[in-house]
UniProtKB/Swiss-Prot annotation:
Lipidated residues (S-palmitoyl cysteine): C315
Glycosylated sites: N29
Compartments, record wording: Cell membrane
Similarity comment: Belongs to the G-protein coupled receptor 1 family.
This protein's name: Melanocyte-stimulating hormone receptor
Extracellular side: 1-37, 94-118, 184-191, 267-279
Sequence ranges on the Cytoplasmic membrane side: 64-72, 141-163, 212-240, 301-317
Mode of membrane association: Multi-pass membrane protein
Species annotation: Ateles paniscus (Black spider monkey)
A Pfam short name: 7tm_1
Alphabetized PROSITE patterns for the sequence: G_PROTEIN_RECEP_F1_1, G_PROTEIN_RECEP_F1_2
GO molecular function: melanocyte-stimulating hormone receptor activity
Subunit structure: Interacts with MGRN1, but does not undergo MGRN1-mediated ubiquitination; this interaction competes with GNAS-binding and thus inhibits agonist-induced cAMP production. Interacts with OPN3; the interaction results in a decrease in MC1R-mediated cAMP signaling and ultimately a decrease in melanin production in melanocytes.
Transmembrane regions: 38-63, 73-93, 119-140, 164-183, 192-211, 241-266, 280-300
Length: 317
């Protein structure tokens, strides 16, 4: 029936497995074990998506307007904003369609709903993969700018950045299409989990390496000017705190989603895992929160971008 197809959450194959879903309620009744399920109101979900949408549209518009921001680093930031924009808009679209179908305001055939769901699935999955890839690309770009400062402009040329961006988008779309087509295979889910862990390790290694170099540089300046050691220690603490926040937000926002995928493979019928599966929308909400935080970390800290954004907003008035 159309409503049955419409009520499936986007990436429904990740939310639960065909064998485990029908028995969740019965298993809980037999054991009497309470199952914690956090309910995310659709209004809150849509509001967070709208905030993310506005933020990332502003980032893309500001970078597109200012030619001084057409550098490899800002190209990666722009693509991160674009992929985050697609993550939030695709989830908003899915939620809006489900609400309209449930309210009877949108009537359509089951085949049309299924095609729409498959399209949104591919869009959501590819945009998530792109977001992870561009977070890694930004880390690589910053690492090159610090450790190869004199050769940075010859290494990170605009042409190479564009080729890397094109490769990321094409690879993400193709891999997400394969993922949706073979989402019932455990190997596909494990590949996604391994990819997330690889991005996490890559970012951690690069940023820790950059922090170590920054601390060495600060220590050298301290010795040169014969200042007290606590100044260097304070810089190290601030850098460590910044690094902890950056990686912590990444892990907290994306980790639960990929933990969910891991549990789908390892324990699809276990009662505890089934309880976790019920909180799938919470994990999507955390990813939406990540798309809200990304512009604050990577884009709005730039004085040039903030100035361009201010000009855009003033011109619009």
């Amino acid at each position: 029936m159309p409503m049955q197809g419409a009520q499936k959450r986007l990436l429904g194959s990740l939310n639960s497995t065909p064998t485990a879903t029908p028995n969740l309620g019965l298993a809980a009744n037999h054991t009497g074990a309470p199952c914690l399920e956090v309910s995310i109101p659709d209004g809150l979900f849509l509001s967070l998506g709208l905030v993310s949408l506005v933020e990332n549209v502003l980032v893309v518009a500001a970078i597109a307007k200012n030619r001084n921001l057409h550098s490899p680093m800002y190209c990666f930031i722009c693509c991160l904003a674009l992929s985050d924009l697609l993550v939030s808009s695709s989830n908003m679209l899915e939620t809006a369609v489900i609400l309209l179908l449930e309210a009877g305001a949108l009537a359509t055939r089951a085949s049309v709903v299924q095609q729409l769901q498959n399209t949104i699935d591919v869009l959501t999955c590819s945009s998530m993969l792109c977001s992870l890839c561009f977070l890694g690309a930004i880390a690589v770009d910053r690492h090159v700018s610090i450790f190869y400062a004199l050769r940075y402009h010859s290494i990170m040329t605009l042409a190479r950045a564009r080729r890397a961006i094109a490769a990321i988008w094409v690879a993400s779309v193709l891999s997400s299409t394969l993922f949706i087509a073979y989402c019932d295979h455990a190997x596909v889910l494990l590949c996604l989990v391994v990819f997330f862990l690889a991005m996490l390790v890559l970012m951690a290694v690069l940023y820790v390496h950059m922090l170590a170099r920054a601390c060495q540089h600060a220590q050298g300046i301290t010795r040169l000017h014969q200042r007290q050691p606590p100044a260097h220690q304070g810089f190290g603490f601030r850098g460590a705190a910044t690094l902890t926040i950056l990686l912590g937000i990444f892990f907290l926002c994306w980790g639960p989603f990929f933990l969910h995928l891991t549990l789908v493979v390892l324990c699809p019928q276990h009662l505890t895992c089934s309880c976790i599966f019920k909180n799938f929308k919470v994990f999507l909400t955390l990813i939406i929160c990540s798309t809200i935080i990304d512009p604050l970390i990577y884009a709005f800290r730039s004085q040039e971008l903030r100035r361009t954004l201010k000009e855009l907003l003033l011109c619009s008035w």
